[in-house]
C-alpha cells in the first residue's frame, strides 16, 4: 500500500496537512484535538516526515540576560515585579559574560542561542549592547534569537541589521483566555510586535504556554491564532506551565501530559514547516512522554540545566535519551523545512 493509500484509509476525513492558503477555524483545531490519540500522532508524524528528518532535533540554549523586575504582570512569571517570588532583579549582563555563556552552550552541543530579558520593552540605551551580543553570538557560528518584550520599528531594524535570526514574542494563550493571565499588555500589542519583527525581515519565534487552567477549546484557540498568522511562525515553542510559588498560577492543577503531547501534534499538523520546540516544563515529562512528543512532531528543545529562572533536564540525561531513541542533534541550518 502506498503512503497516499495508507493516508486515505485512515478514519476521520480531516486533512493531514493544511492546504495553502487555509484558515484554521477554532472548530477545525478542536476536531484535531479530539481525534483518537493514535490517529492524531500518526497524522502528525506523516506531516513531520514530509518536511523534516524525523530523527533530528535541534538543541537550543536559553540565557536570561536580564533577570527580574519586569513591569508586566504575567500570572505565570517569576520575574514579574508584581509577584513576590523571592527573585532578585538584576541589570543587563555584560556582553563578554553573554558570549562566554554562548561558547559554553556551543561546546555542549547547542546550535541555537536564545537571549531573554525581563522587561516590558528595551530602552534605547540598551540597544548597543544588545546588537553587540547578536553579532558576537553569530560570530561563534550559532543561530541567534532574542526575546526582549515589545519592540519599536527602529529597534527591530537595529536587531535585523545586527543579523538577528529570530525574535521570540509569544502569544501565550488564546484571545479568550488571555485576560485571565495578563492585564498590562494587550493581545494586539503582541500581534503588533510580531508585525514589526516580520517587517524588519527577522524570522518569527512565537508560541505559548499551556496548562494555565485554559480549556481544550482555548488551547485550540491559541493554535488557531498561531497557524493563521501570515505566514505562520518559523519557530513555535510550546511551554508546559511551571507553577511557581508566589505567582497567581502557583496552585494550578497540572495538565494531563497526554494533552501536552496532543498540543505538539496539533501544532505540527497546522504549521507543517515550523520548527516545534519543547520549551519550559519539559522537566515535568518523563522519558516516555518526551519520546511521544518527538513522535508527535517536536524537532527542537531547550537544552541546558536552566531556562531563565526554571530548571531543565540535565544535559547528560538528554544525551542518554537521544542515544536510546536513535535521535541526533541537528545543526541550525539543517532545520529548514523541505519544500
Swiss-Prot record:
PROSITE patterns assigned: RADICAL_SAM (PS51918)
Alphabetical UniProt keywords: 2Fe-2S, 4Fe-4S, Biotin biosynthesis, Iron, Iron-sulfur, Metal-binding, S-adenosyl-L-methionine, Transferase
Residue positions binding [2Fe-2S] cluster: 114, 145, 205, 277
Molecular function (Gene Ontology), one example: 4 iron, 4 sulfur cluster binding
Disulfide bonds: none
Residues holding [4Fe-4S] cluster: 70, 74, 77
EC number: 2.8.1.6
Record SMART domains: BATS, Elp3
A GO biological process held by the record: biotin biosynthetic process
Pfam family, one: BATS
Pathway stated in the Swiss-Prot or TrEMBL entry: Cofactor biosynthesis; biotin biosynthesis; biotin from 7,8-diaminononanoate: step 2/2
Domain Radical SAM core: 55-282
SUPFAM superfamilies: Radical SAM enzymes
Cofactor: [4Fe-4S] cluster; [2Fe-2S] cluster
Source organism superkingdom: Bacteria
InterPro entries membership: Aldolase_TIM, BATS_dom, Biotin_synth/BioAB, Biotin_synthase, Elp3/MiaA/NifB-like_rSAM, rSAM
Enzyme class: transferase
Gene3D superfamilies reported in the protein's UniProt record: Aldolase class I
Catalytic activity entry: (4R,5S)-dethiobiotin + (sulfur carrier)-SH + 2 reduced [2Fe-2S]-[ferredoxin] + 2 S-adenosyl-L-methionine = (sulfur carrier)-H + biotin + 2 5'-deoxyadenosine + 2 L-methionine + 2 oxidized [2Fe-2S]-[ferredoxin]
UniProt function note: Catalyzes the conversion of dethiobiotin (DTB) to biotin by the insertion of a sulfur atom into dethiobiotin via a radical-based mechanism.
Family: Belongs to the radical SAM superfamily. Biotin synthase family.
Quaternary data: Homodimer.
Listed name of the protein: Biotin synthase
Gene: bioB
